[in-house]
Amino acid sequence: MLLCSSVSGRSSQSGIFRDKTISSFSLSRSWRKSVMASPPILSLALPSDTGRVLSIQSHTVQGYVGNKSAVFPLQLLGYDVDPINSVQFSNHTGYPTFKGHVLNGQQLWDLIEGLEANDLLYYTHLLTGYIGSVSFLNKVLEVVHQLRCVNPNLTYVCDPVMGDEGKLYVPEDLVSVYREKVVPVASMLTPNQFEAELLTKLRIGSETDGREACNILHATGPSKVVITSINIEGNLLLIGSHQKDKEHAPEQFKIVIPKIPAYFTMMKFQTYCLLKGTGDLMTALLLGWSNKYPNNLDKAAELAVSSLQALLQRTLSDYRRAGFDSQSSSLEIRLIQSQDDIRNPKLTFKADKYT
């Protein structure tokens, strides 16, 4: 069992801010004037009504995937968001070429040590998306542990990006790490159909199967599960489940989602890995709204789906207006242009509760 301790090996501090008071007897008056305590981090000293999010995801200079899809929407919803970029690429890899760097586990830990050294590790939420190696995922688990040492009430929202439509984007050995180590410590999971099947070892061929997959995941750890897309007999569904306590059955619901005839930007890692900017956005919206409606996951999902669908429709409309074929183009989502739909979505999709 891991014990809570300072990541840098120094003595842990009793509060969020270290005492930087300097004895007046040890310094001259002129020197005392030049030595001042660091100003407080206002997002810590004066926290918002929403929270403070650490988001560990990919990043591209151009385009909207990973943190580029998640940070701005969460900020619009009132959150302070600190991004750590697991990769930094010039653009998504659907282009003829790309340049950039991949963060390794030690580099991630260096950043955590830097935050800890200045007592900046207090977060209300951790958000993770695409992770490309077992070593990096194991280091993320250490980050989860350390953040919960600082804030035991930390909410960990995990998008277990592994694959889609029967194909893995990541090394196969990541699946067991997600199933055995990550799921038990997550507060909310947002897998797609294929990822839910991998995590539960259950083939999802019906709504009943989707609900049972949520139950299996609840039994392992997370209180909230949203399977963001399930294709059943030509219909696309979102199935959500909230187990408020272990003594009662979870509250479950579905939202029917229209199919949009377009291929939105997916980010490839290595040969097979795809990371959808729309999926990253959806998980961020679910985090944002579920925190505002902590006991109404169905309401949070309605708002998230309504925002996302409005954004996708705007993206399609803008590309068509510019003369592009939405059937054949790899589209970049119109995130900035859709900020009103993110901040104040028109509720166009309703959840149907299972009884």
What are these regions (language model features)?
Residues 284-292, 306, 310:
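Short glycine/serine- and small hydrophobic-enriched flexible loop segments
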Residues 147-156, 220-223:
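A short helix->loop->beta-strand "cap" motif at the edges of active sites that frequently abuts
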Residues 122-133, 159:
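Short acidic, glycine-rich surface-loop motifs adjacent to enzyme active sites
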Residues 2-103, 342-355:
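Glycine-rich phosphate/adenosyl-contacting loop at the front of the ribokinase-like
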Residues 135-146, 236-238:
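Short Gly/Thr/Asp-enriched flexible loops that form oxyanion-binding sites at enzyme active sites
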Residues 37-42, 298-355:
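Charged C-terminal helix
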Residues 100-116:
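Glycine-rich, highly charged phosphate/nucleotide-binding loops
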Residues 168-272, 293-298:
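Conserved phosphate/ATP/ADP-binding segment of small-molecule kinases
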